[in-house]
């Protein structure tokens, strides 16, 4: 396999415009293409069988936002995707999350498990004390209706932090 230099890699990322001409792809076009590819791969019913798959999917979904977004993967008993939902939006450094709304949606979808996630636009993937407290509140609320909280993933640009991998959940 031949190696590509950065400059040759740049020129290989092309898009076709409305007139059929090939132009260099912008960063936004590349990110959108990556999101679409991952979305296509993880359609409803796809199984989240590894933490790497979960993190790749959530990174593609949440990395580009300039404000906090709290999202949930609702899963069935075999950890297959029922629905991805961006449930709450906030400011550049916080988002209000309401456990009651998350429980209602889990029940509506008949979810057996969830993976919660949010982004840190600051670029720092470390969980705050508020993130840890929220995770515990959500786990307790969801447990009352027999819905398991499998993980809480923080996305910060290309970095992610998994509560499950750190033993925090």
Give the ranges of each region predicted by the language model.
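Active-site-proximal loop/helix of nucleotide/amide-processing enzymes and allied scaffolds
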Residues: 2-32, 36, 53-56, 78, ...
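Long amphipathic N-terminal alpha/beta scaffold segment
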Residues: 25-87
């Amino acid at each position: 396999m031949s190696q590509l230099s950065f400059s040759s890699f740049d020129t290989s990322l092309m898009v076709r415009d409305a007139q059929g001409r090939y132009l260099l792809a912008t960063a936004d076009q590349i990110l959108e293409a990556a999101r679409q590819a991952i979305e296509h791969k993880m359609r409803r019913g796809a199984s989240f069988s590894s933490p790497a798959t979960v993190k790749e999917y959530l990174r593609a979904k949440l990395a580009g936002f300039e404000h906090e977004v709290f999202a949930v993967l609702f899963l069935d008993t075999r950890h297959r995707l029922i629905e991805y939902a961006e449930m709450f939006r906030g400011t550049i450094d916080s988002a209000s999350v309401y456990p009651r709304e998350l429980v209602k949606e889990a029940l509506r979808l008949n979810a057996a498990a969830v993976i919660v996630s949010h982004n840190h636009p600051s670029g720092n993937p470390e969980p705050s004390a508020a993130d840890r407290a929220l995770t515990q509140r959500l786990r307790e609320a969801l447990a009352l209706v027999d819905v398991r909280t499998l993980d809480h993933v923080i996305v910060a640009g290309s970095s992610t932090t998994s509560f499950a991998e750190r033993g925090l959940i």
